[in-house]
Regions:
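Structural motif
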Residues: 78-81, 102-106
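Hydrophobic beta-strand segments of well-ordered beta-sheets in folded domains
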Residues: 74-75, 95-103, 126-129
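Conserved catalytic cores of phosphodiester-cleaving nucleases, focusing on short active-site segments
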Residues: 56-58, 62-86
């Protein structure tokens, strides 16, 4: 199914694939609306040539498409279920400057404990790992699919 969103003043069309929940599609849309101002070249589901494909990504590109010095990816967003192994790999080997995990109504203390055990402090320092936990009723709150900016009352943001 195809969904039309108006996100941060841009029309964004997202496909809900077979087996994909609407919640997953919505988290991609909300994550995009939250971070496109900070990362203007933010893309949704762009293949990047790694073993993993991001739900949201902002490449660190200079002129002519060549990578700039530093992290290969300014921003990488994962929505819904993600393994601790994947999170740790992305932060340690993936060239990710900032990794955001988007969830809906997840048990935050349990997830924070798992993340802190799976990812060494040096790989998550300086705000590199971020958890965004949306309210359980976020689908109702965003039903119009017109989101200029995501209200702070819709989520909790935690640096891990």
């Amino acid at each position: 199914m195809l969904y039309d969103f108006e996100l941060a003043g841009r029309r964004v069309r997202l496909w809900q694939r077979r087996g994909e929940s609407y919640g997953h599609v919505l988290m991609k849309a909300l994550g995009y609306a939250m971070f496109v101002g900070e990362y203007p070249n933010l893309e949704i589901e762009l293949p990047v040539g790694l073993r993993y494909k991001p739900d949201l990504v902002s490449l660190n590109e200079g002129e002519g498409g060549r990578p700039r010095a530093g992290a290969r990816f300014h921003f990488w967003g994962e929505c819904g279920m993600v393994s601790m192994r994947k999170v740790a790999w992305l932060l340690k080997h993936g060239g990710v400057g900032r990794l955001a995990l988007f969830k809906i109504a997840c048990p935050v203390p349990v997830l924070l404990k798992e993340l802190r055990e799976a990812v060494e402090p040096r790989h998550r320092e300086g705000g590199r790992l971020l958890l965004v936990n949306f309210a359980g009723d976020v689908a109702e709150l965003a039903a119009a699919r017109r989101i200029e900016s995501v209200p702070a009352s819709w989520y909790e943001k935690i640096e891990v």
